[in-house]
Amino acid sequence: MYNDKKRLTMINKRLTASVVASLLCIHLVQAQTLPVYLDESKPMEARIEDALQRMTLEEKVAMTHAQSKFSSPGVERLGIPEVWMTDGPHGIRPEVLWDEWDQAGWTNDSCVAFPALTCLAATWNPDMALLYGKSIGEEARYRKKTVILGPGVNIYRTPLNGRNFEYMGEDPYLASRMVVPYIQGVQQNGVAACVKHYALNNHEVNRHTSNIIVDERALREIYLPAFKAAVQEGKAWTLMASYNLYQKQHVCHNQRLLNDILKGEWGFDGAVVSDWGGVHDTEEAIHNGMDMEFGSWTNGLSAGTSNAYDNYYLAHPYLKLIREGKVGTQELDDKVRRILRLIFRT
């Protein structure tokens, strides 16, 4: 009897050791076969570089422009997900059709309509801004969105601006203090805040063609502080460039605002998104800091084509310039790094 028990104990120990060894082997094999870009335990930048070197030229260019009204492609071959965006600063937009602004008629896309951001700013309560951002971020996550197109922090300069209600007031300091916790609250949910409309978009009349004239002191003391706080303190993951011009160059591909100030001085490492249809020139968009082009079906070079999105300025026209050797891929790789950083953060 004693020998039988001893024999069983020995068998159990051997079986346990065998199972443990097998599990360890499986774990080691999985660790060896899991690509770096899919391994969340690896450093973010290592994952980005690993994904980048696996992507084709066509896959990289595809990531820099929309595939629908509110989405851009990932890389299905590599398991890199799409990016899905939604309005807005004070409530998640009902689902729309793939190519249109019309509602899609879903029955499970109802969300809270929060008070507009001008009301939030009037509380002078950063804790409330944090709760507001956290709450709207939760709803965006429920709806499987990557990016919320907000908050807006353009400064009130005229009562005739039809979008004043969705901004945070006329005081640059107040807007700077309220936008930071809003962003932090949203991004706690793994959803990116997209701060808009950078910059100098302070009225809606002729907004696509207005060249804004402002001196350096006013630019730095009135119009930029809230955006700077959003980037450097709020750590916003995306930012939307505006429709207007500054120094006679569209802001969606403006060397001074996007490259020199935003990405240079402020160290912004996220992705710059165009306002819908705000891109007007392929080469400027390549070189001057635009990362993701969004728009409507007939924007830009797309009128009369079978697939409008392939004819956006950062789509086939961009690919054609690279293939012809007229531009390199350094700027493209920077754009894709920023988009991958957005995807891995969310």
For the regions a protein language model found, what residue spans apply to each?
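Glycoside hydrolase catalytic-domain context in secreted enzymes
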Residues: 31-346
